[in-house]
Amino acid sequence: MDDLSGKVAVVTGGAAGIGRGIVEALLEEGVRVVIADVEASVLDDTLKGLHPLGQVRGVVTDVSSAASVEALADDVFATEGACHLLFNNAGVTSGGGGRPWEQEPNDWTWCFSVNVFGVANGMLSFVPRMIESGLPGVVVNTSSMDGGIAPVPYASVYASSKAAISCLTEALAHQLSAACTQLRAAVFYPSGGLLDTGLWTAQRNRPPELARLKPRPPAPGTTFAEFKAQLEAAGRSVDVVDLLELGRFVVRGVKAGDFIIGHGLEEAGAMLHARADAIAEGRLPPAALS
């Protein structure tokens, strides 16, 4: 898919962070973009800033709700006539800390409802219609190096959800190919440095019915600014990712036909080799640290 001009894209979680970077990069390519986001006020503010850049509109959507995503698909196909690019990008953290035994059921439900079921809902509502259209298209699911490649121990639930996305996307890609469709799938691993996204404060959108029964006090380093300051105080070099450049990187990967889109894949490959060696020998794989 070399020329994206005039194509229609849907980006979930597109009002801020990585999603907004992808949206801006798509607009640069002449793509008509529909942003799906759960935060109406943030979505409105984002649209005001993006309207001068191209054809873009928003639909308030809760990706954890199958009905909400189905309504989004109804809107897109009725209004735009097609969907060529679907970016299942919305994501959250569990908010329960790192130790698996300290996570509450609501932590698991909250994280998986957005990160896993959000992707599944997008697939279920859009992919059959995209196949039926007979048009070339791409489904891009946002995973993470944390879980998608190797789990970081202090983010156990989040890592588990991202591992699920990687497995689902790989299965989707094989099935789309076997069915001889015009669609393909790709998995995106955001990387390249420290990411200043809404993931740091994702708990602001957590539904009351999924609140923790035992609230946790904010831990040091739980915001982007705090974590960045901690790294700098420890003498570590901090590279903050330009989210628009990251969005452009994703779009280039889509145009190139890549299945895996991400920086630092050689390093990830070395990590996977170490994991594979450990698994082959029956050992616990080495912990990934970020």
Question: What is each model feature region?
Answer:
Residues 2-34:
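Canonical Rossmann dinucleotide-binding motif of NAD(H)/NADP(H)-dependent dehydrogenases/reductases
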Residues 7, 55, 82-83, 130-143, ...:
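Active-site loop of short-chain dehydrogenase/reductase
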Residues 40-41, 59-71, 105, 142:
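The beta1-alpha1 cofactor-binding region of Rossmann-like NAD(H)/NADP(H)-dependent oxidoreductases
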Residues 51, 57-60, 66-81, 126:
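Conserved amphipathic alpha-helix within the SDR
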Residues 97-100, 104-109:
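Substrate-binding pocket helix/loop in short-chain dehydrogenase/reductase
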Residues 140-164, 169-170, 174-178, 191-194, ...:
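Catalytic loop of short-chain dehydrogenase/reductase
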Residues 177-261:
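SDR active-site lid
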